[in-house]
UniProtKB/Swiss-Prot annotation:
Cellular component GO terms, alphabetical: cytosolic large ribosomal subunit
Source taxon at top rank: Bacteria
Source organism of this protein record: Blochmanniella pennsylvanica (strain BPEN)
SUPFAM superfamilies with a match to the protein in the record: L35p-like
UniProt xrefs under InterPro entries: Ribosomal_bL35, Ribosomal_bL35-like, Ribosomal_bL35_CS, Ribosomal_bL35_sf
Gene3D superfamilies according to UniProt: 4.10.410.60
PROSITE patterns: RIBOSOMAL_L35 (PS00936)
Gene Ontology biological process terms from the UniProt entry: translation
Protein name, entry field: Large ribosomal subunit protein bL35
Length: 65
């Protein structure tokens, strides 16, 4: 049986933590930032932990990570 391929787009977007959770960077921080408040931009700069509902999907995309 052949090996399962890793989805490269997912491997570039998600990193696994020491506890086995997946962290990712928020979207909406590239351009059109003048209408966003400073507080909103500050929260977007921080990394987030992936919710459990998406965990099975991401584990299919990243079988060896």
């Amino acid at each position: 049986m052949p090996k399962i391929k890793t989805l490269q787009a997912a491997s570039k977007r998600f990193k696994i933590t020491a506890l086995g959770k997946y962290k990712y960077k928020h979207a909406n921080m590239r351009h059109i930032l003048t209408k966003k408040s400073t507080k909103h931009k500050r929260h977007l700069r921080q990394k987030s932990i992936l919710p459990k509902i998406y965990l099975t999907t991401i584990m299919k995309y990243l079988p060896y990570i």
